[in-house]
């Protein structure tokens, strides 16, 4: 497998995993600030 493809898949998986967590964290922060 090309390492560029592997890197893209890793980044994609990372974004999919961290995205929702970041959104939840940001919404919690917003609620705390307000």
UniProtKB/Swiss-Prot annotation:
<comment type="similarity">
    <text>Belongs to the Psb30/Ycf12 family.</text>
</comment>
<keyword id="KW-1133">Transmembrane helix</keyword>
<keyword id="KW-0812">Transmembrane</keyword>
<dbReference type="Pfam" id="PF05969">
    <property type="entry name" value="PSII_Ycf12"/>
</dbReference>
<dbReference type="InterPro" id="IPR010284">
    <property type="entry name" value="PSII_Ycf12_core-subunit"/>
</dbReference>
<dbReference type="GO" id="GO:0009523">
    <property type="term" value="C:photosystem II"/>
</dbReference>
<keyword id="KW-0604">Photosystem II</keyword>
<keyword id="KW-0602">Photosynthesis</keyword>
<keyword id="KW-0472">Membrane</keyword>
<protein>
    <recommendedName>
        <fullName>Photosystem II reaction center protein Psb30</fullName>
    </recommendedName>
</protein>
<comment type="subunit">
    <text>PSII is composed of 1 copy each of membrane proteins PsbA, PsbB, PsbC, PsbD, PsbE, PsbF, PsbH, PsbI, PsbJ, PsbK, PsbL, PsbM, PsbT, PsbX, PsbY, PsbZ, Psb30/Ycf12, peripheral proteins of the oxygen-evolving complex and a large number of cofactors. It forms dimeric complexes.</text>
</comment>
<keyword id="KW-0150">Chloroplast</keyword>
<keyword id="KW-0934">Plastid</keyword>
<feature type="transmembrane region" description="Helical">
    <location>
        <begin position="5"/>
        <end position="25"/>
    </location>
</feature>
<dbReference type="GO" id="GO:0015979">
    <property type="term" value="P:photosynthesis"/>
</dbReference>
<dbReference type="GO" id="GO:0009535">
    <property type="term" value="C:chloroplast thylakoid membrane"/>
</dbReference>
<comment type="function">
    <text>A core subunit of photosystem II (PSII), probably helps stabilize the reaction center.</text>
</comment>
<keyword id="KW-0793">Thylakoid</keyword>
